[in-house]
Amino acid sequence: MSGSTGERSFADIITSIRYWIIHSITIPSLFIAGWLFVSTGLAYDVFGSPRPNEYFTETRQGIPLITGRFDSLEQLDEFSRSF
């Protein structure tokens, strides 16, 4: 037999009007904020990932693969200069 912790049950919480008033505002707000974060391109700037049109440039159409084991730093420098 378990004792009572004095907390409200989950069923009481999700059936209360106050819960739905608060969450009917916060859930759509989070969705809209996430959509704006991605659609404005701010997510690309914050995380440093290239935009879809920046993966392949006019001069570099191939995939930047590191092929040499001992000259990998030179290849990385060459790839970073091409950006």
From Swiss-Prot:
<keyword id="KW-0934">Plastid</keyword>
<keyword id="KW-0150">Chloroplast</keyword>
<dbReference type="Pfam" id="PF00284">
    <property type="entry name" value="Cytochrom_B559a"/>
</dbReference>
<dbReference type="InterPro" id="IPR006217">
    <property type="entry name" value="PSII_cyt_b559_asu"/>
</dbReference>
<dbReference type="GO" id="GO:0020037">
    <property type="term" value="F:heme binding"/>
</dbReference>
<keyword id="KW-0249">Electron transport</keyword>
<dbReference type="GO" id="GO:0005506">
    <property type="term" value="F:iron ion binding"/>
</dbReference>
<dbReference type="GO" id="GO:0009055">
    <property type="term" value="F:electron transfer activity"/>
</dbReference>
<dbReference type="GO" id="GO:0009767">
    <property type="term" value="P:photosynthetic electron transport chain"/>
</dbReference>
<protein>
    <recommendedName>
        <fullName>Cytochrome b559 subunit alpha</fullName>
    </recommendedName>
</protein>
<comment type="function">
    <text>This b-type cytochrome is tightly associated with the reaction center of photosystem II (PSII). PSII is a light-driven water:plastoquinone oxidoreductase that uses light energy to abstract electrons from H(2)O, generating O(2) and a proton gradient subsequently used for ATP formation. It consists of a core antenna complex that captures photons, and an electron transfer chain that converts photonic excitation into a charge separation.</text>
</comment>
<comment type="subunit">
    <text>Heterodimer of an alpha subunit and a beta subunit. PSII is composed of 1 copy each of membrane proteins PsbA, PsbB, PsbC, PsbD, PsbE, PsbF, PsbH, PsbI, PsbJ, PsbK, PsbL, PsbM, PsbT, PsbX, PsbY, PsbZ, Psb30/Ycf12, at least 3 peripheral proteins of the oxygen-evolving complex and a large number of cofactors. It forms dimeric complexes.</text>
</comment>
<keyword id="KW-0604">Photosystem II</keyword>
<keyword id="KW-0812">Transmembrane</keyword>
<dbReference type="InterPro" id="IPR037025">
    <property type="entry name" value="PSII_cyt_b559_asu_sf"/>
</dbReference>
<dbReference type="GO" id="GO:0009535">
    <property type="term" value="C:chloroplast thylakoid membrane"/>
</dbReference>
<keyword id="KW-0602">Photosynthesis</keyword>
<feature type="transmembrane region" description="Helical">
    <location>
        <begin position="21"/>
        <end position="35"/>
    </location>
</feature>
<feature type="binding site" description="axial binding residue">
    <location>
        <position position="23"/>
    </location>
    <ligand>
        <name>heme</name>
    </ligand>
</feature>
<keyword id="KW-0472">Membrane</keyword>
<keyword id="KW-0408">Iron</keyword>
<comment type="similarity">
    <text>Belongs to the PsbE/PsbF family.</text>
</comment>
<dbReference type="InterPro" id="IPR013082">
    <property type="entry name" value="PSII_cytb559_asu_lum"/>
</dbReference>
<dbReference type="Pfam" id="PF00283">
    <property type="entry name" value="Cytochrom_B559"/>
</dbReference>
<keyword id="KW-0479">Metal-binding</keyword>
<keyword id="KW-0793">Thylakoid</keyword>
<keyword id="KW-0349">Heme</keyword>
<dbReference type="GO" id="GO:0009539">
    <property type="term" value="C:photosystem II reaction center"/>
</dbReference>
<keyword id="KW-0813">Transport</keyword>
<dbReference type="InterPro" id="IPR013081">
    <property type="entry name" value="PSII_cyt_b559_N"/>
</dbReference>
<dbReference type="InterPro" id="IPR006216">
    <property type="entry name" value="PSII_cyt_b559_CS"/>
</dbReference>
<keyword id="KW-1133">Transmembrane helix</keyword>
